[in-house]
Swiss-Prot record:
Pfam families the record matches: Methyltransf_4
Organism of provenance: Campylobacter jejuni (strain RM1221)
Protein family: Belongs to the class I-like SAM-binding methyltransferase superfamily. TrmB family.
Catalytic activity: guanosine(46) in tRNA + S-adenosyl-L-methionine = N(7)-methylguanosine(46) in tRNA + S-adenosyl-L-homocysteine
Binding site for S-adenosyl-L-methionine: 123, 148, 175
InterPro entries: SAM-dependent_MTases_sf, tRNA_(Gua-N-7)_MeTrfase_Trmb, tRNA_methyltr_TrmB_bact
Pathway it works in: tRNA modification; N(7)-methylguanine-tRNA biosynthesis
Name used for this protein in its record: tRNA (guanine-N(7)-)-methyltransferase
UniProt KW keywords: Methyltransferase, S-adenosyl-L-methionine, Transferase, tRNA processing
Alphabetized SUPFAM superfamilies for the sequence: S-adenosyl-L-methionine-dependent methyltransferases (SSF53335)
Length: 392
């Protein structure tokens, strides 16, 4: 994560803008200050954290922009405008950094849904993008949707797609399990999962699980196919066991088969003479219904100035666990007379993190989370907890 350390920070008078970067407002607690930052069409927090002999300034990891160049540019402007005596820095805004809006990266779920049409393939964890771009070139009439949790991978593959004149891809930063849960039933032709982290010693951290397999079965078309490629026999066998729970699945199992395209990980494993396993699954024959997306309905909550004072005074780092969701109040920040809450919530295997802005009403400081049932339940619980636990 790009960052730098400064001995001194000047007085921060906001709003402040320069070179398409805007610093609009600041929220803080005893240890951390968050600056609401806009670069072109994206918003995120810069984080200022007290450290030994100075301050560390970096991007907040739960709101970081989809383009690393946006964060680098914001850090550069903040350093020049508000910092003195720079101790060290670990960022550099390169001339070829991806700053301009690219059509290949979608920033949120609503934008993604509006652009999904026709045949769709999904690649989970596309990494360097070799296989994703190969599929896009081989299938020009198919939309290749890549989902990845690491921002640098999105930027890198978007650059490659532009350079190679590949136009039938979409990239989104997300947990794959979240993405699948909001796609329409029977809308995807293929799902690729190539060389996932095997987590052989911590299988609970694998993306593969019963719920994930059910979601694959739901979103795949009647003849749609899930394809796993892995160097871990344990992962291969675990995945097979999960899909064997379906009534009449069909499988294709292969070992050490060379494909037309090879990832950098596959090249490495082959040099080490490791075995490579392929598992294809189809014919799920499962009746599925589209989920109805409810609203978070935050408009029903209103606060007085006295309410906000009580929330600030009584705030505790607490976690509430229910059968199918959780809610964790992580931190609270003061923003003038208003408050900012950082919370984690949702399904246990698909947690969300977000900031909630509290003034007379309550709203998400950034984009809304995915509207899956576990998230809806967690936000409803949050509204009740604000009244009961924090005594307003």
């Amino acid at each position: 994560m790009p960052n730098f350390k400064s001995k001194k920070i000047k007085e921060i008078n906001l709003p402040y803008s320069k070179d398409d970067v805007e610093f609009l407002w600041l929220a803080k607690n005893d240890n951390v200050s968050l600056i609401y930052t806009k670069v072109q069409e994206e918003s995120f927090f810069l984080q200022i954290k007290k450290a030994q002999n100075g301050f560390v300034i970096k991007g907040d990891k739960h709101t970081k922009p989809s383009k690393i160049g946006y964060l680098q540019k914001a850090l550069k402007i903040f350093k020049e405008g508000f910092c003195e005596d720079i101790i060290n820095e670990a960022f550099g805004l390169k001339n070829n950094a991806l700053i301009e809006k690219t059509p290949f990266i979608v920033d949120n779920f609503d934008e993604l849904l509006s652009r999904l049409q026709g045949k769709i393939y999904i690649e989970i964890g596309f990494g360097s993008g070799r296989h994703l771009l190969y599929q896009a070139k081989e299938n020009p009439n198919v939309l290749i949707l890549g989902v990845e949790i690491y921002n640098p991978a999105l930027t890198q593959v978007a650059k490659l797609a532009k350079a190679q004149n590949v136009n039938n891809i979409l990239l989104i930063q997300s947990d794959a399990r979240l993405l699948l849960s909001v796609l329409k039933s029977k809308s995807v032709e293929k799902i690729f999962l190539h060389f996932p982290v095997p987590w052989d010693k911590k299988p609970h951290r694998r993306v593969i699980g019963k719920d994930f397999c059910k979601e694959c079965a739901r979103v795949l078309t009647q003849n749609g196919r899930f394809e796993l490629r892995t160097d871990s026999f344990e992962y291969f066998n675990f995945t097979l066991e999960q899909f064997l729970t379906f009534p009449v699945p069909k499988f294709s199992l292969r070992k050490n088969e060379n494909l037309e395209i090879s990832s950098k990980y596959e090249d490495r494993w082959k040099k080490q003479e490791k075995n490579i396993y392929d598992l294809w699954v189809w014919n799920f024959n499962q009746e599925c219904k589209n989920y109805e997306l409810n609203e978070f309905n935050l408009s029903s909550v209103e606060f007085s100035k006295e309410d906000l004072k009580k929330i600030e005074q009584n705030f505790k780092n607490i976690t509430i666990k229910k059968d199918d969701f959780f809610l964790h109040f992580e931190s609270i920040y003061k923003q003038d007379e208003n408050l900012l809450l950082k919370v984690a919530f949702g399904a246990f295997n698909k947690p969300e993190h977000c900031y909630l802005h509290l003034d007379k009403t309550i709203d998400f400081a950034f984009k809304e989370p995915f509207k899956i049932q576990e998230n809806i339940k967690a936000i409803n619980e949050l509204k009740e907890i604000l009244k009961v636990q924090f005594k307003i």
